[in-house]
Amino acid sequence: MAETRRKVLEVLNGKSLTPPPIWLMRQAGRYLPEYRATRAKAGSFLDLCYTPDLAVEVTLQPIRRYAFDAAILFSDILVIPDALHRNVRFEEGHGPRMDPIDTDGIAGLKADGILSHLSPVFETVARLRRELPEETTLLGFCGAPWTVATYMIAGRGTPDQAPARLFAYRHPKAFEELLAFLADVSADYLVAQIDAGADAVQIFDSWAGVLGEDEFARFAVEPVRRMIASVRARRPSAKIIAFAKGAGLLLKDYRRLTGADAIGLDWAVPLAFAAELQKDGPVQGNLDPMRVVAGGGAMESGIDRILDVLGNGPLIFNLGHGITPEADPENVSALVARVRGTKG
């Protein structure tokens, strides 16, 4: 019997595959009618994340429909602040909300009980690894310390995360303590996901793009480096993707400085620059999600350009950020077919 291949893992090990493996950020999401039906049963969004029966189901839905090469655990980057009792809630039309943290709150943070609070997530991971096709890579994930901290400081998302940037300037010691704490507990969380059955993990730094050069080094690079070093100290073979959205030219040294195996690229990263980054190792991305909403020629030309420029090197095809609720599931079918059929 032929050995089962997990193509995403092969690329994370530096192999170039034609066609490249494909999965999509937020592939389990509101664009799918089956997701909306399951979501309606769940109660709150966090109930969906913490109920293994439901979290397993929504993770598997896009695999059944599209046979993506990877499944990504259905959860949220804000389960860490939820485990820290920050009263996290998701309000319709307003996004995430939580109790803002101050310097006293940072001084009082304790890691006790975080992993037990998140035990339903690990049950979901273990069940997914049993239920997924053998060839499907299972990805775990967490938020990067900077991005999680922005929500903890402001108590919500803001257009440019000015509250966290201001807090970092006014209270530099407390802010760096918060980032170090989040790096350590997030590393513990990723190790637990790997131990439960995740084949690889992704670190999402969705708000890296609001940082200046010096702040990027201190708040985006250093905490992620600390996380990855902590994971690798315990699980040396761990495969890690790091996605610093909006980082632009600061991605040049991001892989080397953080130790990530692969770097995620948003849709604004020029493909010529992406090709330079790919010389150092695998890249993931980077189709504009709006091309999937548009479909047709706009989507096809975007796919073809990425494959033309990056398809001969180690590439995991993905979007440049999460798929949006307006995307037509049929367009996603066409996307997958074109990625798998254009080359080779």
From Swiss-Prot:
Gene3D superfamilies registered for this protein in UniProt: 3.20.20.210
EC class of the enzyme, as a word: lyase
Gene Ontology annotations of biological process type: protoporphyrinogen IX biosynthetic process from glutamate
Gene Ontology cellular component terms for the protein in this record: cytosol
EC identifiers of the protein: 4.1.1.37
Site entry (Transition state stabilizer), positions: D76
Molecular function, one GO term: uroporphyrinogen decarboxylase activity
SUPFAM superfamilies: UROD/MetE-like (SSF51726)
Pathway as given in its UniProt record: Porphyrin-containing compound metabolism; protoporphyrin-IX biosynthesis; coproporphyrinogen-III from 5-aminolevulinate: step 4/4
Disulfide bonds: none
Compartments, as annotated in UniProt: Cytoplasm
Sites where the protein binds substrate: R26, Q27, A28, G29, R30, D76, Y151, S206, H321
Catalytic activity from the UniProt record: uroporphyrinogen III + 4 H(+) = coproporphyrinogen III + 4 CO2
Entry-linked Pfam families: URO-D
Subunit description: Homodimer.
Protein family according to the UniProt entry: Belongs to the uroporphyrinogen decarboxylase family.
HAMAP family tied to this protein: URO_D
UniProt function note: Catalyzes the decarboxylation of four acetate groups of uroporphyrinogen-III to yield coproporphyrinogen-III.
PANTHER family: METHYLTETRAHYDROFOLATE:HOMOCYSTEINE METHYLTRANSFERASE RELATED, UROPORPHYRINOGEN DECARBOXYLASE
Protein name: Uroporphyrinogen decarboxylase
Organism: Sinorhizobium fredii (strain NBRC 101917 / NGR234)
Gene that encodes the chain: hemE
